[in-house]
């Protein structure tokens, strides 16, 4: 159940990269911001509407075999390498840095995700794929499954020379209906990304819940202090703080959420 009628006190909860739970397999190195799989913590099941934020590295030729999902909005953001998606509805796509992907599981879908882009007429490679995958519930259960991807590299700028803009990546909010972004079936949430050169900054949106994840580099969060790669800030009743990149630049992912999952 989702609750949007909220009375909240301003708060910033910093979660360091090394506080996350860790899954280390031969083919997978995964860091979990929230409870996931065998890593269950009843005090850390979600923030706002965000249920999963996994920071994954998958070795070449390996990946997640076909598995099911239902009633979940899943957004994937690649940082390095490429990830191949295939699902039971006939969708196939190669996801790379700056290309956002969304899968709405709805009534049920099965898919695989693998680091084997050479199957799509590419050259074999030995590069890991590094990506962040985020899950949240949809507004309505049992919708038709769907898939969408969108390249927003033009808006973001190059990894090493970012535009410095906070770009809408995925949204179900009415305010973003006319924006170039992938659509998610969740009217209370939007995902932004920014690639920041050294010293560049962006202003965070005002929202009941804001989740800031440092995907690359390091930043300074106004009023809080430094955040390094893999760190996150969970902000309640937030808005207006500036995020400034450190000397090596940064890439950040920001969720704006106007509701939370009811306890």
Q: What does each model-identified segment do?
A:
Residues 1-263:
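Jelly-roll (double-stranded beta-helix
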């Amino acid at each position: 159940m989702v609750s949007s009628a909220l009375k909240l006190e301003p708060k910033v909860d910093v979660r360091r990269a090394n506080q996350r739970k860790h899954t280390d397999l031969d083919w997978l190195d995964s860091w979990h911001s929230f409870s996931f799989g065998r890593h269950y913590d009843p005090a850390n099941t979600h923030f706002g509407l965000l249920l999963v934020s996994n920071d994954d590295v998958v070795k070449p030729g390996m990946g997640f075999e076909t598995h099911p999902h239902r009633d979940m909005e899943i957004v994937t953001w690649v940082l390095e390498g490429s990830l191949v998606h295939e699902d039971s509805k006939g969708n196939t796509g190669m996801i790379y840095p700056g290309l956002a992907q969304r899968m709405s599981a709805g009534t049920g879908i099965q898919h695989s995700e693998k680091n084997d882009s050479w199957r799509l007429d590419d050259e074999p490679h030995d590069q890991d794929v590094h990506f962040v995958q985020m899950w949240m519930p949809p507004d309505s259960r049992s919708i038709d499954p769907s898939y969408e991807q969108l390249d927003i590299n033009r808006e973001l700028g190059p990894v090493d020379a970012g535009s410095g803009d906070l770009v809408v990546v995925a949204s179900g909010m009415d305010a973003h209906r006319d924006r170039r972004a992938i659509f998610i079936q969740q009217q209370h949430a939007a995902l932004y990304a920014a690639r920041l050169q050294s010293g560049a900054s962006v202003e965070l949106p005002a929202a009941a819940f804001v989740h800031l994840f440092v995907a690359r580099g390091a930043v300074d969060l106004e009023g809080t202090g430094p955040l390094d790669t893999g760190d996150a800030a969970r902000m309640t009743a937030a808005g207006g703080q500036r995020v400034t990149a450190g000397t090596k630049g940064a890439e950040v992912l920001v969720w704006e959420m106007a509701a939370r999952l009811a306890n």
